[in-house]
């Protein structure tokens, strides 16, 4: 069984956009669709003193965002079984949140 896993930091996103949990839920669903994954259910969103996490568990992978809105920080974590391409999901999230991928 083959899979791909990508973790990317997005920059240039306004803190107001990152503070919208409904918007974060919507982009995780859109990212999963772009990768070709079907969700098990709705995204789970949890907020705490170190930011907000949105997690979408899917058949064949996951889409997770880790956000600290006050710092305009968004880390995207996508795992997909082949032939899914996590980069497609990251591109969808970057486009919808109006962020730029920070290459390592």
How would you describe each model-predicted region?
Residues 1-104:
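Polybasic/polar functional segments that serve as interface/processing modules
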